[in-house]
């Protein structure tokens, strides 16, 4: 009787095994890839076994700027640099940023670490920074207890000259040298994500492929844009959902790489409904999230301010966009996303070709801006297909409108003409300004519908300007904090009202 399971797809590809000491600067091992319904199996190709059991592995020296030059061995890091902090001045060009990627942060119980240095950009040109360097401070601002997002914001706001205080972390550098260059973190590493490991226990370095190894396809990350400088685009990167395992593969040509990526992604997609159901059960049991429904889940590739990229798992609910570095598998992990963007204060500002310099297919990118009490957060993401781009952009816009219709009204304290007031903004009733002096009756000072609003603006600090025309003209409200949250909510209400009238598709 037939089992009902289709035969796995198999093929011969190359697996990146790590940095080599020869002229090539890196080693590739032929491997047989077998795609099954829920897993990917990688086996040594016939005639190309891994090293003999018990064979000595040459120690891998620290690499200058995280990459070996073709035709030369990796230069070892001077021993003196391992013992003391260093100050490195980076001078940024007019375009390109610092040219580094970072990992770690307080939420991962690790310092902020340089995980990749991009060839030819500002950090690389110093010849004084290394993959595995911990960033202790930026222009004197301490990062020793910073979260990943806080560090990104500090680096993003730097000027043309940046002074980095760094210290090389020998214990964790093997993970970042390998993951930054697209190599595997090692099949035999202990069952914990390298980013969540203590620096004192980094685990073994990556090993050659000796036996068949298996990677679960459950919510795996699949990308073809991990080597932007490759003119043939024949590389694949597959990461497990928990971030423990990474496969960096090379196909014979672009068509083969595209075919394999599509086939692997199709299998991942068949498993996604099961993952969605599991997360929905966890979300329903998480008191902070209430009973929100999950509208969409999937991997995005985020463009970082440093110029690198990072896989980001996005979970879209009725009210929020939740972003994670790996698949949350417990209620605690689900309740602690790396970032949260309330949909009512989030705006899709770009979809399609990017105007900036993006090291991957900018045709499949989109940008989001979120108004917060600290200002505006902007994030650029890309996906793997036009279908994904259309689905994400449509659901994000619809989600913003649903959130606006659900909230209906928001209020905030403010000052108008020296008087303490309360501003209420209602999706149907418009703007109402109430007197809010202690002991005074709650009196309406001003009421205007949305239809009368001719222009709105803010100073980015605390002032909101609303122009309703007529005798009243423009009014100035002091919200006592950054007005961006209220500005974005007003935009969401307006957009939802226009869509409700059928003026937008």
From Swiss-Prot:
Residues 449-505 form the SU domain. It is a peripheral membrane protein. Residues 483-505 are annotated as: Calmodulin-binding. The keyword Calcium applies. Phosphorylated by CaM-kinase II. Phosphorylation may inhibit the interaction with DMD. Residues 1-77, 180-211 are annotated as: Disordered. SMART domains: PDZ (SM00228), PH (SM00233). GO terms for cellular component: anchoring junction; cytoplasm; cytoskeleton; dystrophin-associated glycoprotein complex; neuromuscular junction; sarcolemma. Gene3D superfamilies: 2.30.42.10, Pleckstrin-homology domain (PH domain)/Phosphotyrosine-binding domain (PTB). Disulfide bonds: none annotated. Adapter protein that binds to and probably organizes the subcellular localization of a variety of membrane proteins. May link various receptors to the actin cytoskeleton and the extracellular matrix via the dystrophin glycoprotein complex. Plays an important role in synapse formation and in the organization of UTRN and acetylcholine receptors at the neuromuscular synapse. Binds to phosphatidylinositol 4,5-bisphosphate. Monomer and homodimer. Interacts with the dystrophin related protein DTNA; SGCG of the dystrophin glycoprotein complex; NOS1; GRB2; GA; TGFA; MAPK12 and the sodium channel proteins SCN4A and SCN5A. Interacts with the dystrophin protein DMD in a calmodulin dependent manner and with related protein UTRN; SGCA of the dystrophin glycoprotein complex; F-actin; calmodulin and with the other members of the syntrophin family SNTB1 and SNTB2. Interacts with MYOC; regulates muscle hypertrophy. Interacts with DTNB. This is Alpha-1-syntrophin. It comes from Bos taurus (Bovine). The gene is SNTA1.
